[in-house]
Regions:
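Electrostatic cytochrome c docking/interface patches
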Residues: 12-24, 91-115, 131
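Terminal, regulation- and interaction-focused segments at domain boundaries
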Residues: 207-246, 338
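Beta-strand/loop substructures that line and gate deep hydrophobic ligand-binding cavities in soluble
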Residues: 293-319
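Ser/Thr-rich, low-complexity intrinsically disordered terminal regions
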Residues: 235-292
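The canonical Cys-X-X-Cys-His
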Residues: 24-35, 85, 89, 112, ...
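Extracytoplasmic electron-transfer domains, predominantly the class I c-type cytochrome c fold
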Residues: 36, 40, 45-93, 138-200
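Sec-dependent N-terminal signal peptides
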Residues: 4-13
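Well-ordered alpha/beta subsegment
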Residues: 312, 316-342
């Protein structure tokens, strides 16, 4: 009897130990890719796309992510967990994924560059970073692109995509992103040249923000003026920078009752609606921190002008395009704060 009990336990152990791909996907992936891969902030995992990418590519994409883009890496997932996620995603089509050779395809990168500039640069950009803004599918994207062209210079893509897979996509095309088929337009050797050139692409060095504020959660400047004058100075500087100013609020408003609000702590909220479409196109999650604000506080006999470090905040979104905007916004906000406190 004891023997059969041990045998039963041993047979059941793999069942209990096997990772749940559906649960792992819903926990780690569904927020961006939706529950059945419809896409949203992240790319749609459509039948067309899944028919063109291997299980190995999906697994490596999960493992490496897309540095500087919305797609994070998942180093904490075990190999078994990654495999479970891949199997779950693959189950949506009911078909096995393609298997590609791992051998390098030989070509002339110089000739590939000329072909890339002629056939690919319009959508994928001069440096391979992908023309347009944003990643995945967003409501604000121009409808000419259901999916934005891939960032071919991204290290995550370079590590995940085999030469053979890239060759097939070039030849077959991809309807969902308006990528045409180059079968009959490029010879096999010309495709090899393009692939050789793609392997030379590298991501651009990220633009850095002001070193003085690097790593700090907020910009803080002391004003030589009283609270009321400083508030007006900030508003004038914002108006001069083409920002629309929202009705004034106190910092504690909504957090305590109206009789306890500290009226010596003012929150000045502002936005440039002309740029709002552009920003939400880059990353719709940005809506969680909009509108921008500068706070003016009277504290311990001093008047302080404070704003969140937007360059630092932007890095939390894992989106290089947004990080670039964060640096530009940092320059504008610091200029406004400096003008208000001169």
């Amino acid at each position: 009897m004891r023997y059969w009990s041990w045998l039963f336990l041993l047979l059941c152990m793999p069942l209990y130990a096997a990772p749940d791909g559906k649960a792992l996907y819903e926990e780690n992936c569904s927020a961006c890719h939706h529950f059945r891969g419809q896409g949203g902030i992240g790319l749609p995992l459509s039948t067309e796309i899944l028919s063109q990418v291997s299980d190995d590519y999906i697994a490596k994409t999960i493992r490496h992510g897309r540095p500087g883009r919305i797609m994070p890496s998942f180093p904490k997932l075990s190999s078994a967990q990654v495999t479970a996620v891949v199997r779950y995603v693959r189950s949506w089509t009911g078909k096995p994924g393609p298997v590609f050779e791992t051998a390098k395809i030989r070509g002339d990168a110089k000739k590939g560059n000329a072909l890339y500039q002629k056939h690919c640069v319009r959508c994928h950009g001069k440096d391979g970073s992908g023309e347009g803004v944003g990643t995945g599918v967003t409501l604000s994207r121009e409808r000419s692109f259901m999916v934005m062209p891939a960032a071919l210079n991204n290290s995550g893509f370079q590590k995940s995509a085999s030469d053979a897979m890239i060759r097939d996509i070039i030849l077959i095309g991809r309807k969902s992103s308006n990528m045409p088929s180059f079968r009959g337009k490029l010879s096999g050797q010309e495709v090899a040249h393009v692939i050789a050139y793609l392997r030379t692409l590298e991501p651009p060095a990220p633009r850095k923000g002001a070193e003085e504020w690097a790593g700090k959660p907020a910009y803080v400047m002391e004003s030589p003026y009283d609270l009321e004058t400083t508030v007006e100075n900030v508003k004038q500087a914002l108006a001069g920078a083409n920002f629309r100013i929202f009705p004034q609020r106190y910092l504690e408003q909504g957090l305590t009752d109206e009789f306890s609000v500290n009226v010596r702590q003012v929150a000045i909220r502002f936005c440039n609606f002309k740029e709002l479409y552009h920003l939400l196109n880059i990353d719709p999650r940005l809506g969680t921190v909009l509108p921008c604000r500068i706070n003016v506080l009277e504290q311990n006999g001093k008047v302080l002008v404070i704003s969140a470090n937007v360059a630092q905040l932007a890095t939390l979104f894992n989106n290089q395009e947004l990080s670039e905007v964060g640096v530009l916004m940092e320059e504008i906000i610091l200029t406004v704060m400096e003008e208000a406190t001169l």
